[in-house]
Amino acid sequence: MRQFAVTICLALLVACAEKPTVADTLPAPIVQPSLPVPMAPAPSSVDTPVLPTQTFAEWQQGFRQQALRSGVDAQLFDRAFEGVTPDMSVIKADRSQPEFSRPVWEYLDGAISPTRVRRGQAMLEQYADVLSSIEQRYGVERQVLVAVWGMESSFGQIQGDKSVIRSLATLAYEGRRPEFAQSQLLAALQILQNGDIQPERMLGSWAGAMGQTQFIPTTYNSHAVDFDGDGRRDIWNSAADALASTAHYLQSSGWQSGQTWGMEVRLPDGFDYALADGSSRKPVSEWQRLGVAALPGSAVPAGSENASAALLLPAGYRGPAFLVFDNFRAILKYNNSSSYALGVSLLAQRLQGSGYIQGAWPKDDTPLTRTERIELQSLLSARNYDAGAPDGIIGANTRKAIRSAQQSMGWPADGYPTHKLLEALRTQQ
């Protein structure tokens, strides 16, 4: 899990030997710039890199003193850092700003691919007893746990092969967020000191996410559990530990046992799309009063009639609409991306034979490139719609500015960045 994310909010003996397809192995993004603003705050992905003013050896010596003051054993520190040098591939990944992003419908195609669904159903059967025990203890449904497992590491097969110590040391030395990386590095050393894993086996992603459900070190220290009773919280090699740790985290994030994540809905003609920001919450009864209705043949889930929900439009007013409840928010705390939370939610349903979206995606409306998003932000601000810094990230300020511009043009104010809006702003120059 990542909370970097985040979590961001993770080697397993996988019984299913089927080789994953390309769609099945695509990593879930932390932030999908073309999606609504997540409900929980996420670290900026465009923080300015901190250029080192000292050598790596000098930085390491200073950090060693800090670690020892925090209770890390000197011999353990020296063993963990033996031969460690900066990993330039980590720096490259940290500073990468992709020009192109996938639209949400393509992301979801990978998240709930037939291969992933089949393998998830096989995992549900293989780990049925373990999952029953986890459900009983933490109250998180097994399909959700298996969905997270599949999204994060393809059921333990793709956990990352980088040294967590080296990656985090590199990021602490010259990454965009050195203080965050340093806190994670200190937490990683504490994991080693607790004896849960050896330094050479502590592998993960370039960002330091670890194990079968991709915990960052601080999240591991607060939520990882030894569910199989072997004395170690082994989220790398024990499916039971990884799944139970995920359940523990979701439980702590407000998971409501027996409740749904959300539901697809239809909106009335003339609906005020400014209400659909993915975070403003109203009782379901209030949404119904505004004309938001269940799809034909469906109904508000039992027990959710008086629940508080937000309205989510992942692809703007032309795409499907969803009311999302507390459990969706809990998934966002695991990984602060609306696309990720929607992927987990739909995959969990698909494992039970449901989770099919009825609304059509606006596939003729491809996402803006990073260069185009920066131009859009600059044009908005030039017209007194404060979009914030032109960084290519469509955050809260930019969406608010987009809504204001859309309202002034008499368009549906869904806050969704489109080529049509960009062209309209260009012609106003």
Regions found by a protein language model. Give the residues of each.
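C-terminal motif of bacterial Sec signal peptides marking the signal peptidase cleavage site
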Residues: 12-15
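Bacterial signal peptide processing site
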Residues: 17-19
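Mature N-terminal segment immediately following signal peptide/propeptide cleavage
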Residues: 48-83
